């Protein structure tokens, strides 16, 4: 799945940031240090994207993108390592693939509920309840995936020799950025 979506995902995020090849090499170098600590050896690939939005993402199979907007907000290499460690866990654990699979299953459940309740006077209520249930289930799994990525990402960060405090300063940066919205 990751390989199939990788090119399209990069293009949708503004394309590769080709102005500074040294920056791309630096990000890949830090990423590869952390990937070496990962529990799953994948052909990790790190790319800097020409997008001003502070964000990073991972696809199954080890494809990881970091927006240049996020790089501008980071204060240290350790914070970059914290971001990349987190994304490595998402890629290694297949969180993206699991979310897509869950989404397809939940869509099927909603469709089945819609068809089954079609002739009932309570069809709107049944479909609404199924939709809310699906949303709550998806949020729980998303929260668990984030906690897993935070936990193992911290382990990889420390194993690679970075200061674990960077995870805290990175979270403070994310809080500051979210307050600006």
State the predicted function of each range.
Residues 1-181:
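A Zn2+-metalloprotease active-site environment signal
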């Amino acid at each position: 799945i990751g390989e199939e979506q990788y090119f399209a995902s990069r293009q949708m995020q503004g394309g590769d940031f080709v102005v500074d090849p040294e920056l791309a090499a630096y990000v890949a170098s830090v990423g590869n240090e952390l990937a070496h600590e990962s529990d799953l050896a994948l052909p990790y690939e790190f790319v800097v994207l020409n997008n001003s939005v502070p964000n990073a993402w991972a696809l199954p199979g080890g494809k990881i993108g970091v927006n240049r907007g996020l790089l501008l907000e980071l204060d240290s290499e350790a914070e970059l390592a914290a971001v990349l460690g987190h994304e490595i866990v998402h890629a290694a654990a297949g969180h993206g693939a699991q979310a897509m699979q869950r989404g397809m299953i939940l869509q099927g459940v909603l469709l089945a509920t819609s068809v089954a309740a079609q002739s009932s006077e309570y069809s709107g209520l049944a479909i609404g309840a199924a939709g809310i249930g699906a949303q709550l289930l998806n949020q729980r799994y998303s929260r668990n995936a984030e906690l897993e990525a935070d936990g193992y990402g911290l382990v990889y960060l420390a194993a690679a020799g970075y200061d674990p405090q960077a995870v805290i300063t990175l979270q403070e940066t994310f809080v500051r950025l979210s307050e600006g919205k």
